[in-house]
Amino acid sequence: VIGKVGKEHIPIPFNFSSIETMFSSKEANIIKSHLLEEHGNEVKVPILNLMKSKNRFVKELADYVYTNIFFNYTKKMWDLEPQELDPAVLSRVPIQIGYDDRYFHDKYQSMPKYGYTKMFQKILDHPNIEVKLRTHFKDISNPEEFKKIIYTGPIDEYFDYRHGELPYRSIRFEFFTENKEYTQKVATINYPGFEYKHTRVTEFKHMTFQ
């Protein structure tokens, strides 16, 4: 994943490669040395933690990243400013102290050979699975027959809105096809700036190796 920040394309999560792209070599080396001194190497630090740093270089970097990436992207995604959200939301994409630009660090990572649609079709085709369409959760007449029921609907609706309605925000997906091998160099490009109406563009070929 990379982000379009101004005229530059920088790796996200924000890491040492991002710093080297956005700052001069001298500035980047100073910033990296202070980050390493304060936090160590190959660790992930939430942006809000960096913003509380007493180190001038670390604090200035954190403010820069917050203003140019986190604030705009959060406002576009949720229509709320970061301080209006639970801190855990911003902690999902921490700053990486080092050059690792991966979102996930699991030892084993994979994708279904024939895609998720085919995988779920085969799962639901099992003789022990009954699929009921257009059926409301509360209209199931025999829930006691099942050891476990997994509810995936709105959680406030499940509790009959006894605590009110939650402020959900929807996402609009737009799909388009271009007659070329690839349209971008990586799978996903994020667009945090307000000059773009969209938040990201994903080219799935990079992930499925079509």
Tell me what each language-model feature is.
Residues 1-9, 44-61, 162, 167, ...:
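Short, charge-rich amphipathic segments
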Residues 4-7, 41, 99, 116, ...:
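Intrinsically disordered, low-complexity regions
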Residues 10-12, 45, 93, 191:
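Intrinsic-disorder/low-complexity coil detector
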Residues 18-148, 152, 157-159:
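Active-site/ligand-binding neighborhood in enzyme catalytic cores
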Residues 135-210:
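Mid-domain catalytic core of redox enzymes
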